[in-house]
């Protein structure tokens, strides 16, 4: 009996190809056209997206990307490539591909890359530790569309999330401990997760519960009392209510109340990107300090650290 050849597909959100208004506009158009991300009626959404949002937001967002752009590309792409390469080195007999829901490399090109390696089983690892229909669901949808066009379909193992995975929690905890050792233990550890519309949670998306699970497990691993760990949600978009409490409003409130030293981690981001390096490390730092806070540090994402790569290898091992 022929032995199954397995490949691994690392999936993430995506990024513009360049920090320019044109590239950002292409990326945002694809991203904000996905019904998993924005499910508003197309009759209402298309004119708003094309006539207002893209023309106004693209130049502004391009400037933000330019402020964090690295020599080899956007931070998300640089760190994602490092993750792919490190995991491939860790698993030398297993092809590892990287695909993005929006932009390039596309999920379709990554599937084709693995099929060209003659794999007959693909382990899909969306790099979203906490499930949401707007992220993991989007990967699932696109993968289904890709495979629907194939005459031969490989076996698929799809990892829904890993919010309470032991290796993941330990890697986060060690990162926090290293930051505490470097900067001193803060008055409060704030865990900021990407937000989603509250309506999505009301309709069954268990994302907030998965975020609470990670928060609880991380606090336990650190031996921290609940009063010293807070969970918030960032990056809201549009006018409808999103998951609360909001990160920026919370930081302002904490600064005004006299909390002096805060460290912020974003456990839901497997790789640093615009939302962590600019929004959290820069914008929200100014919010906290401007409200009276004294000391603020951002704890980097796990990126391609050895512990993170080992976690990925262990996570996919059960499916290989």
Curated annotation (Swiss-Prot):
Transmembrane segments: none annotated. It is found in: Cytoplasm. PROSITE patterns: FERROCHELATASE. Keywords: Cytoplasm, Heme biosynthesis, Iron, Lyase, Metal-binding, Porphyrin biosynthesis. Fe cation binds at residues 194, 275. Its EC number is 4.98.1.1. The keyword Metal-binding applies. Catalyzes the ferrous insertion into protoporphyrin IX. NCBIfam families: hemH. This is Ferrochelatase. The lineage of its organism: Bacteria, Pseudomonadati, Pseudomonadota, Gammaproteobacteria, Enterobacterales. The gene is hemH.
């Amino acid at each position: 009996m022929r032995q199954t050849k397995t490949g691994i597909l690392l999936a993430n959100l995506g990024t513009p190809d360049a920090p320019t208004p044109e590239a950002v506009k292409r990326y945002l158009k694809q991203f904000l056209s996905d019904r998993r991300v924005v499910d508003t009626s197309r009759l209402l959404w298309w004119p708003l997206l094309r006539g207002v949002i893209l023309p106004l937001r693209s130049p502004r967002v391009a400037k933000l990307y330019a402020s964090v752009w690295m020599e080899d590309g956007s931070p998300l792409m640089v760190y994602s490539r490092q993750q792919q390469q490190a995991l491939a080195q860790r698993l030398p007999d297993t092809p590892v591909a990287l695909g993005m829901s929006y932009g390039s490399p596309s999920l379709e090109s990554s599937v084709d890359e693995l099929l060209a390696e003659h794999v007959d089983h693909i382990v899909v690892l969306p790099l979203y530790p906490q499930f949401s229909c707007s992220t993991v669901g989007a990967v699932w949808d696109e993968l289904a569309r890709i495979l629907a066009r194939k005459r031969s379909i490989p076996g698929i193992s799809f990892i829904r999330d890993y919010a309470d995975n032991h290796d993941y929690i330990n890697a986060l905890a060690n990162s926090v401990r290293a930051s505490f050792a470097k900067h001193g233990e803060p008055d409060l550890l704030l865990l900021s997760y990407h937000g989603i519309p509250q309506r999505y949670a009301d309709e069954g998306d268990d994302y907030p519960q998965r975020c609470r699970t990670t928060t609880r497990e991380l606090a336990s691993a650190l031996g921290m009392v609940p009063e010293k760990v807070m969970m918030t949600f960032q990056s809201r978009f549009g006018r409808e209510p999103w998951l609360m409490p909001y990160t920026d409003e919370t930081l302002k409130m904490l600064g005004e109340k006299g909390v002096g030293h805060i460290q912020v981690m974003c456990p839901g981001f497997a790789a640093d990107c615009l939302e962590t390096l600019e929004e959290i490390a820069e914008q929200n730092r100014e919010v906290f300090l401007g409200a009276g806070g004294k000391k603020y540090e951002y704890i980097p994402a796990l990126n391609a650290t050895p512990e993170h790569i080992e976690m990925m290898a262990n996570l996919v091992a059960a499916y290989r």
